[in-house]
Amino acid sequence: MAKPKSPSRRELLTNGVKAAGVTCLAGLALTAYVESASKAEAKALRPPGALPEDDFLAACVRCGLCVRACPYDTLRLAEMGEEAPLGTPFFVARETPCFMCTDVPCAKACPTGALDRDIPNIRKADMGVAVLVGHESCLNYKGITCSICHRVCPIRDEAITLEVQTIKGRRMVIPTVHSDKCTGCGTCEKHCVLGQAAIRVLPRELGLGGRGRNPAGRAV
């Protein structure tokens, strides 16, 4: 059997340069991705007590302690391609909402102050705001009374109320979000009976309209 031919020094150098080039390009791509993600419009829901997004990103060290402290596995660290900058904590309301622990263990676990450890009351948390985005799909707008989002709301009759409205000559019971009371916990979105939730929780700066009104029509 012929002895395998050993690669020449030139081949070794060439392969080494190619590998270094690939590694360099991958590193540049990752750096560009992280930079672009950090500058992207905030779309992720942050843990309770989070600082304003820019301050939060500056203070968060991506340690994951808040994720480990959450007893309901609500929080997770963002992976590449997700809606939050890489390694930062966020949650997806449709999957697992915030259960609004009164002792706020996630915030207390934060070592840098990216989450306010002295948040006085979980009801003062500002994770986002619920918005009725699917008027055409919401059962109430079809004349079918559905009160799921109202019934599951942990601040029922304050954050979400049911109001009788006359729409196109028909009296309907419509869920109405009061943005000054909503914490953005996401329980309403989680339990919406539709395949694609008609009510969604968005970061407050996205969920509120330009004139200080919730897109559903409620004043801030």
UniProtKB/Swiss-Prot annotation:
InterPro entries (alphabetical): 4Fe4S_Fe-S-bd (IPR017896), 4Fe4S_Fe_S_CS (IPR017900), MauM_NapG (IPR004494), TAT_signal (IPR006311)
Annotated [4Fe-4S] cluster 4 binding sites: C153, C182, C185, C188
Pfam family, one: Fer4_7
Binding site residues for [4Fe-4S] cluster 1: C60, C63, C66, C110
CDD domains to which the protein is assigned, alphabetical: DMSOR_beta_like
An annotated Gene Ontology molecular function: 4 iron, 4 sulfur cluster binding
SUPFAM superfamilies found in the cross-reference section: 4Fe-4S ferredoxins
Boundaries of every 4Fe-4S ferredoxin-type domain copy: 50-80, 88-120, 173-204
Secretion signal, residue range per the UniProt entry: none
Pathway, per record: One-carbon metabolism; methylamine degradation
Binding site for [4Fe-4S] cluster 3: C138, C146, C149, C192
Sequence positions that bind [4Fe-4S] cluster 2: C70, C98, C101, C106
Keywords: 4Fe-4S, Electron transport, Iron, Iron-sulfur, Metal-binding, Repeat, Transport
Role, per record: Involved in electron transfer.
Protein name: Methylamine utilization ferredoxin-type protein MauM
Organism: Methylorubrum extorquens (strain ATCC 14718 / DSM 1338 / JCM 2805 / NCIMB 9133 / AM1)
